[in-house]
Design a protein with these regions (language model features):
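Domain-level signal for soluble alpha/beta catalytic cores
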Residues: 1-187
Length: 187
C-alpha cells in the first residue's frame, strides 16, 4: 500500500459514469447524480481520514468519464458543448473537499478542452487522461504530443498534468522516445 511504501496516494471518487447521459440510462435524475457525486467524495474523505499519515498525503479526486465510449470518439462535441455537458458534475465536486478533477479515457481534444474550461470556471485543478490506441495515437488519429499541445494552447496550459490510461505501455513507449517538451506534461 501507499502507506507501507511511504508515498502519497490519489483517492479517485468512483464517479466515472456519474454524468447526465449515463445517469439517464439508469433512470437517475440530475439531482440524484449530484447526490451520488457528493456521496462518493464523502466516502473518499472517510478513507483519507482513516488512512492518511503526514508522510503519506492523500489527495481526493472527483473522477470524470467521457460523454461517450472511452475508446471510440463517436460524434465529437464542440468545446462549448463539452464544457456545458461536464459543468454540473465539476461544479458539484467544487462544493466538496475534492482537491482536483481527473478526466479519464478522454478520446478527443474538444472534450478535453471543454472539461478543462469547466474546471477552470469552478477553480478546480484538473488532470486529463487520454486514451491511446496501439499506435500511440488518440482514437481520433491525433498524436499524443499534438493533443497535449492543442489543449494547452486552448486553455493556457490549464491541466496540472496529463496522463495516459487504459493502454499498455508498449502502445506509446516509442512516442516517448521522440523529443519534445510535451513529455514534461505527462505524469
Amino acid at each position: 500500500t501507499a502507506r507501507d511504501a511511504g508515498v502519497g496516494f490519489i483517492l479517485e471518487a468512483p464517479t466515472w459514469r456519474a454524468n447526465p447521459d449515463w445517469g439517464a440510462k439508469l433512470g437517475y435524475s440530475p439531482e440524484a447524480l449530484d447526490a451520488i457525486n457528493l456521496d462518493a467524495v464523502a466516502l473518499m474523505e472517510e478513507m483519507r481520514g482513516e488512512f492518511e499519515m503526514p508522510e503519506t498525503p492523500m489527495v481526493i479526486s472527483g473522477q470524470i468519464g467521457p460523454r461517450g465510449d472511452g475508446y471510440d470518439p463517436g460524434e465529437i462535441m464542440s468545446v462549448e458543448e463539452a464544457q456545458a455537458y461536464h459543468d454540473r458534475q465539476i461544479a458539484v465536486f467544487a462544493r466538496t473537499n475534492a482537491d482536483m478533477i481527473t478526466a479519464l479515457t478522454i478520446t478527443n481534444t474538444a472534450e478535453a478542452i471543454g472539461i478543462t474550461k469547466a474546471a477552470q470556471a469552478a477553480a478546480m485543478p484538473v488532470v486529463i487522461g487520454f486514451t491511446v490506441e496501439t499506435d500511440g495515437c488518440l482514437p481520433t488519429g491525433q498524436t499524443l504530443a499534438d493533443a497535449i499541445k492543442e489543449v494547452d494552447d486552448a486553455t493556457a496550459s490549464g491541466p496540472i498534468y496529463y496522463m495516459v490510461n487504459c493502454a499498455h505501455p508498449s502502445h506509446f513507449e516509442d512516442k516517448l522516445a521522440d523529443g519534445g517538451d510535451w513529455k514534461n506534461r505527462l505524469r
